C-alpha cells in the first residue's frame, strides 16, 4: 500500500521552487521563440524553466503525443513487463492508421525493439497503436494509462484521446507539460539510442526492407541533440520537443505552432544556444544511485534499497559557485509491504545556502512482498530467542 508524503512535500514536488539561478525575468527578456505560438526551455535534471512563452496554453501536440506513448513502453521495459525481443502482432486496426507510418500489415509481427524504432525515428502511427494494444489490450485502455500517467506527473493541462496525436476532439497539451513528459522519458537512458538515431532500417534481410529517417533533423545538424519528437498537423502546425546534452548539462526545448519546419528548427536551435551559453549544471547523483536502506514492516525482507528516480544536479548561471550544497532525505512514514519496484517511498531535497533548489522522488529499487504469517512468526520468535 502506498504511503503518501506530507502535503507540503507533495506540493513542492508538483510546483518546484528554484534558487536565484533560475530567473523568470531573465528568461522572459530573452528574444526567443518569436515565431512560435508557445515555447518553453528547461534544464532536464532540475526541471528549472529557463525561458517560456505561453507555456501553459493548451494546444494540439500532434505526434509529440508519442512521447507519452514511449514513456509507457519504456516503463514496461524497465519493470520487466515486456522485453525488447518480444514479438508484437499488428492488428487490422493498427495497420489501418493513416499519416506517418511504417506500413505494418495486418498480422505482421515485429519486435518491441523495431516498434520503438518505428515510433521514435519514423513517428509511426501504426507502430504506436500496435504497441498500445500490446501493452493494454486495446487503444482505449492504453489512452486511460496515458492520462493516468499524466496525472501522476502533475500535468494539469494535458488530456489524451489517442496514442498517435492524429487530430481528434479533447486531445491537447502545453509546451510546459510536454517538457515535463520529455523529462520523464529521458530518465530511461536507453531511449536516446532510438530518438537520437538519424537513420535505421526495419525488416532487415527481407525484400521489404524499410528505411527510417528521423523526422527530427536536428539530430543530425545540431551537435548534442539526441531526441525527442516532432509533430505536425494542419491545426497544430510544426512542433518539436528537442533535447540536447553538452558536458554535464541536458536541456529540453519545446516549440508549438511554427509555420514551417525551418522556423521550428531555428526557434529550437536558438533556445538551445541560449541555455548552453548562459547556464551550467553540476551533477550530484545518477539515476538509481543508492541513498539509504529503509526498514519495511511486514515484508519478506526487512529492508529495501532506496534509490534516486532520476539524475539529480544543481543548476547555476555560468561561473556561479556551487558551494554550500546540502541534501536532506525525507522518507514516507511507516513503509509497509508490499512495495513495487519504482514505487515512491521518500523525497531527496537539495538545498543551497539553506534554500531548497530542487526536490526529487526516491523510489524502491526492488519489489518487497508481504511476508506470510509463518515468516513473521519465525522472525518474531527469532528476535525473542535472541533477546533471551
Q: Would you name each region that the model predicts?
A:
Residues 1-6:
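Positively charged n-region of N-terminal signal peptides that target proteins for export
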Residues 15-16, 79, 206, 286:
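Residues in and immediately flanking transmembrane alpha helices
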Residues 22-189:
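Active-site-adjacent loops and short helices of periplasmic peptidoglycan-processing enzymes
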Residues 155-156, 167-172, 176-388:
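Domain-terminus/edge residues, biased toward the C-terminal soluble/receptor-binding domains
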Residues 17, 81, 139, 203-204:
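A short hydrophobic/aromatic micro-motif that marks alpha-helical segments and, especially, helix-coil
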Residues 14-22:
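C-terminal segment of classical bacterial N-terminal signal peptides
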